[in-house]
Amino acid sequence: MNQYQNKNEYEILESSQNNMNMPNRYPFADDPNAVMKNGNYKDWVNECEGSNISPSPAAAITSKIVSIVLKTLAKAVASSLADSIKSSLGISKTITENNVSQVSMVQVHQIINRRIQETILDLGESSLNGLVAIYNRDYLGALEAWNNNKSNINYQTNVAEAFKTVEREFFTKLKGIYRTSSSQITLLPTFTQAANLHLSMLRDAVMYQEGWNLQSHINYSKELDDALEDYTNYCVEVYTKGLNALRGSTAIDWLEFNSFRRDMTLMVLDLVAIFPNYNPVRYPLSTKISLSRKIYTDPVGRTDSPSFGDWTNTGRTLANFNDLEREVTDSPSLVKWLGDMTIYTGAIDSYRPTSPGDRIGVWYGNINAFYHTGRTDVVMFRQTGDTAYEDPSTFISNILYDDIYKLDLRAAAVSTIQGAMDTTFGVSSSRFFDIRGRNQLYQSNKPYPSLPITITFPGEESSEGNANDYSHLLCDVKILQEDSSNICEGRSSLLSHAWTHASLDRNNTILPDEITQIPAVTAYELRGNSSVVAGPGSTGGDLVKMSYHSVWSFKVYCSELKNYRVRIRYASHGNCQFLMKRWPSTGVAPRQWARHNVQGTFSNSMRYEAFKYLDIFTITPEENNFAFTIDLESGGDLFIDKIEFIPVSGSAFEYEGKQNIEKTQKAVNDLFIN
């Protein structure tokens, strides 16, 4: 978190005198751990501006791995096996060179305040590095040799034997030592990395079983399905258990809770959401994957300063667990794209009844405009904080089209008495780095010695992200303020930022040569008894819940007019019937419709096996922009995760005919078997 220090009884801002060697416990919004020397203000500011702030190593490394996996799956079929091997080598190299297992275990233990046992540290580090070593040397080496000469019997035998040996090692570790009861939470990021590699191997076996001449009596498709279910449920259950254990009552409790939620989303849940795409039967083409979840960086403030009270322990801010959780996070909703912001400047000062103090202009309130996917009109204006006028308001424009991937802020604070618990905090400056290079600035006209704070996420190649390589974009900014009616000195204005993954597409673009996944929460409208509910942890975002007499509407942009098979990934709490329609851009009358009945898929918890796939129809778009609706006509609750578009060769009529023949043949075969 952000540590500060006062220069005199009225001024603030540097890092703590005693924390030069303190690890960055709460990543992504940290101070540079710099201490002001005996110099003047300009020297100190110059020193601060040279500071380099980076995210926690474990989360940063894993975020890069997620970017590589997304890129690999997006080119899985379009590229050659040689390219796939190269990507796999890149993932394993990232794991070993950055010692992912060790840094992730240390990070988790820092969050949950437990002393890590050396035996567990050694176990996780040595086992994952050992698995990656044989994965690279034995399996990928043999796979590359076979790919270069597939007719060579020796290479065929070698890759089959290497697969069986290495796969057995992964299976044993993932079923055994990684699930040690006392260290499940600590080892979860390590488990997830190993599971990711194991699933990629099983996918290869399904795809190349015949070419490798693997044993025909082993059903590798079933092995893969079983592993997907097991690994997904295990990761979600352990994550949920660890998160719930961190619930508390204080602001410090919330910081640990939010840090765990954010880092484990990056280290575990993002990969888990990608797991289903390793099924080559269901995903035979390259796949465009979108993650719609949000993560929240810590409020821009400070903790652990010996000289002044901090925002986690003062009456000037929301400083308890429940208030912070309510104010910082959003309830599940359709994806809202941040369009623009109007920022208002107020003042904080060190006012005392006997003498006036120093006034500092800070960000005191803002009004955000939000858009839904596929809509050009503002769907919501939301204000947090006050519309103060210490300075003229600042307008940050065109955020909707210019992704903001990085922030540079200046945090300021004052207090009436050194060591008092009435310290007041605020942000006097914030620069927004966007992909167009405009880098708009909010700047108070009353600057003050202040601490530079950078908030950023790594790209695939860059450690801090840049306009051409970034993984997250800003989706919301809020001011956190409390009722200050009884506080004469003013109140704190702390900034909270929310971020979403850069894979999310604001246009719902359907690609012509890839399977396109579109999260259900990118709809533009819900009507009737429909709502958005929290996802189970494995879906990469929230779900649309449809109850009796509800309608879900969403728009898409089709980059090439060709045939696509449309299917949904869903879970159903009871049997239900729904009607899906395709509409032209004019919306006068539907072009196509299909009615489906689905069976209930779960009754209690929404685990991996609760989600099913349903083919709706095959479409032949007449125009680039069109829309879909689903009307739940009867039955239980339907939970929609995503809608998928699969490119189809030939005419829609030919494809539907082929599908009907295959269904009939399967029914006949099942009849004779039974």
Swiss-Prot record:
Recorded superkingdom: Bacteria
Keyword Hydrolase found: no
GO biological process terms, semicolon-separated: sporulation resulting in formation of a cellular spore; symbiont-mediated killing of host cell
GO MF terms held by the record: signaling receptor binding; toxin activity
Keywords: Sporulation, Toxin, Virulence
Keyword hit for Chloroplast: no
SUPFAM superfamilies per record: delta-Endotoxin (insectocide), middle domain, delta-Endotoxin (insectocide), N-terminal domain, Galactose-binding domain-like
Function: Promotes colloidosmotic lysis by binding to the midgut epithelial cells of insects.
Miscellaneous: Toxic segment of the protein is located in the N-terminus.
PANTHER family per record: ENDOTOXIN_N DOMAIN-CONTAINING PROTEIN-RELATED (PTHR37003), PESTICIDAL CRYSTAL PROTEIN N-TERMINAL DOMAIN-CONTAINING PROTEIN (PTHR37003:SF2)
Family: Belongs to the delta endotoxin family.
Protein name per Swiss-Prot or TrEMBL: Pesticidal crystal protein Cry24Aa
